[in-house]
């Protein structure tokens, strides 16, 4: 069943409403630009159902993006690994699989779609896996990558890390 917004509210809003409406035991997300192949889905599904991962993220190990996108992506993934202590190589790959309980336990807003693995970890889901997926040239749409994302990304990461560590007791940040 599809959900149609009156306008484009962004990827986080789309994921959030999809997670709210989902009913299956396993939820798969994938970007509509088809840079990831639907043929990868059965293996992700198996990793959730048989290998008992809470979340499995795709890893575009070999990328077909311009140099101007791959360097910032590597920096982003390094910073996200350090801030979250999650050993993923590709936090932002749109191809992911989740147990239903994971997507029902997190709320995604703003630009937090980049940090779903961290949000899941901070919600108590620590069995996070990764699978190498084939990256393909974009078939549809245009990239949203730009200076604004590069500047806001670190601020969002700080927010997620802060909420993960101090969300339930924010005064502990001040030593209280």
Spans of model-derived segments:
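Alpha-helical bilayer-embedded segments of polytopic membrane proteins, i.e.
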Residues: 162-176
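Conserved alpha/beta core of the MobA/IspD/sugar-nucleotide pyrophosphorylase nucleotidyltransferase superfamily
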Residues: 128-131
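Short aromatic/hydrophobic "clamp" motif used to bind/position activated sugar donors
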Residues: 27
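Acceptor/aglycone-binding surface of glycosyltransferases and processive sugar-polymer synthases
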Residues: 5-7, 11-21, 38-119, 136-155
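The conserved acidic donor/metal-binding loop of glycosyltransferases
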Residues: 31-35
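Acidic donor-binding segment of Leloir-type glycosyltransferases
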Residues: 1-3
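Structural signal for membrane-spanning alpha-helices in multi-pass inner-membrane proteins
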Residues: 81, 160-163
């Amino acid at each position: 069943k599809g959900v149609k917004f009156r306008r484009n509210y962004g990827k986080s809003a789309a994921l959030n409403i999809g997670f709210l409406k989902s009913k299956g035991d396993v939820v798969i997300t994938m970007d509509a630009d088809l840079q990831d192949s639907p043929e990868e889905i059965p293996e992700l599904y198996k990793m959730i159902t048989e290998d008992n991962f809470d979340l499995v993220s795709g890893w575009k190990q070999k990328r077909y993006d311009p140099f101007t996108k791959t360097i910032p992506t590597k920096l982003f993934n390094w910073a996200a690994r350090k801030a979250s202590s999650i050993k993923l190589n590709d936090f932002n790959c749109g191809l992911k699989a989740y147990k239903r309980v994971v997507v029902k336990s997190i709320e995604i807003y703003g630009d937090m779609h980049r940090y779903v693995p961290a949000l899941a970890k901070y919600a108590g889901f620590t069995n996070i896996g990764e699978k190498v997926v084939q990256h393909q040239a974009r078939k549809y749409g245009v990239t949203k990558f730009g200076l604004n994302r590069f500047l806001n990304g670190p601020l969002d990461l700080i927010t997620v890390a802060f909420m993960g560590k101090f969300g339930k007791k924010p005064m502990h940040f001040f030593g209280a």
